[in-house]
């Protein structure tokens, strides 16, 4: 677990470094002076001011004590600044490029990682994962498994000595591929036949059970399912697969964020409904939200240790997904993030008004408070998952 946490910390640091480097390079290319490039948040651990570097003159490069973050400090960062070399003095389009350069770098990093993985083995985690017919091929590293999670008392399953932990091999001579397929075969047997044939594996031994089942009857089992571990391999189409997979998971991430926000808002509103049924439904929605979100503690303490056990390819795949998540998060219109800063800047431009330093500080402070509150809640939920 410790190794997984260390790997996760390194990956997160590198992804944030890449994001901030995007901002810094874009600033330099658009005539904005970069004063500081830092990994982590203060207090300062080590640092050095370099007279001449690829980010400009007299840039201070720092590593700070608080990890999981980073920043670029530019000259005249407030929109109202107007001296030569100030961020505020740059044109609207120059600021737009600077603000979204970090997002672009995160997407580029994800696409590059996924392209390399498409050559050496890209973990396939969804059935419709992007691939190119005629080139991409799927290899099953570890077959899936459907097993009996529980047996209902006095049910057909119990009467025929089907036990919790039994692995389902075949139902009616058809190979078991998923829990959904088993449910369908059981229903077909109860509707069209008077018996069901089940082949199970118990303690390494295969056993066949033939049980009578009447029309509409249930077998009386709950199933647990472990998905097959599959890898996708491509040759000439690897760059296409890398970009396509990046776009696919970007879309899924946006959809996921929308669903979470929708459930959060409706869940909170429904909590005040007079109907007990609606309030219970609200509790379920909020519980789903709590299970769907993961912060740094969850990523480092749960996800990376599990991914580490599955090898380098899964770690790289997870790094790509986190890079996509960083890009999506920074596009969102939250004032303290890149997308929020751009939205505020755009609103003031459309209104033809100057965004004063005081107004910008107040808006950013509100955004930061919202972010810190969300992070506090997510961190608490992460710790509950570690138990």
Region locations from a protein language model:
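Juxtamembrane boundary at the C-terminal end of a transmembrane helix
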Residues: 377-387
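PDZ-domain C-terminal substructure recognizer with occasional recognition of PDZ-binding tails
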Residues: 163, 169-170, 181-224
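Pore domain of cation channels
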Residues: 95-110, 116, 314-331, 337
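Functional transmembrane alpha-helices
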Residues: 90, 141, 214-326, 346-362
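Conserved PDZ fold ligand-binding element
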Residues: 149, 157-180, 246
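A short glycine-leucine-enriched loop at secondary-structure breakpoints
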Residues: 138-142, 155-167, 188-191
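Small-residue-rich helix-interface/hinge motifs
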Residues: 3-83, 322-324, 329-351
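Internal alpha-helical transmembrane segments
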Residues: 7, 11, 29, 59-62, ...
């Amino acid at each position: 677990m410790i190794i997984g946490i260390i790997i996760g910390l390194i990956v997160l640091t590198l992804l944030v470094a890449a994001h901030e480097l995007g901002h810094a390079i874009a600033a330099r290319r658009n005539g904005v002076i970069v004063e500081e490039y830092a990994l982590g948040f203060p207090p300062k651990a080590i640092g050095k001011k370099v007279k001449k570097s690829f980010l400009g003159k007299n840039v201070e490069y720092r590593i700070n004590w608080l990890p999981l973050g980073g920043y670029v400090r530019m000259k005249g960062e407030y929109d109202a600044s107007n001296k030569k070399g100030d961020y505020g003095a740059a044109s609207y389009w120059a600021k737009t490029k600077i603000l979204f350069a970090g997002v672009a770098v995160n997407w580029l990093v994800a696409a590059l990682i996924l392209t390399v993985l498409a050559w050496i083995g890209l973990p396939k985690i969804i059935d419709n994962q992007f691939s190119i017919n005629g080139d991409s091929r799927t290899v099953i590293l570890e077959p899936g498994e459907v097993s009996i999670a529980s047996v209902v008392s006095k049910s057909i399953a119990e009467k025929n000595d089907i036990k919790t932990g039994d692995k389902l091999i075949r139902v009616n001579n058809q190979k078991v591929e998923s829990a959904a397929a088993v449910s369908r075969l059981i229903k077909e047997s109860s509707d069209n036949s008077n018996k069901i044939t089940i082949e199970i594996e118990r303690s390494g031994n295969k056993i066949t059970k033939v049980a009578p089942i009447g029309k509409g009857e249930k077998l009386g089992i709950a199933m647990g399912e472990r998905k097959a571990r599959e890898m996708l391999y491509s040759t000439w189409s690897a760059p296409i697969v890398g970009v396509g997979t990046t776009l696919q998971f970007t879309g899924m991430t946006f959809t996921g964020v929308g669903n979470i926000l929708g459930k959060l808002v409706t869940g909170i509103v429904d909590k005040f409904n007079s109907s007990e049924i609606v309030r219970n439904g609200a509790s379920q929605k909020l519980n789903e939200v709590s299970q769907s979100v993961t912060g740094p503690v969850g990523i480092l303490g749960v996800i990376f240790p599990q991914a580490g056990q599955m090898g380098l390819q899964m770690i790289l795949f997870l790094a790509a997904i986190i890079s996509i998540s960083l890009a999506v998060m920074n596009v969102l219109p939250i004032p303290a993030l890149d997308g929020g800063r751009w939205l505020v800047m755009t609103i003031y431009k459309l209104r033809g008004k100057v965004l004063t330093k005081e107004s910008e500080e107040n808006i950013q402070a509100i955004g930061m408070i919202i972010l810190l509150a969300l992070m506090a809640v997510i961190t608490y939920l992460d710790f509950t998952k570690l138990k």
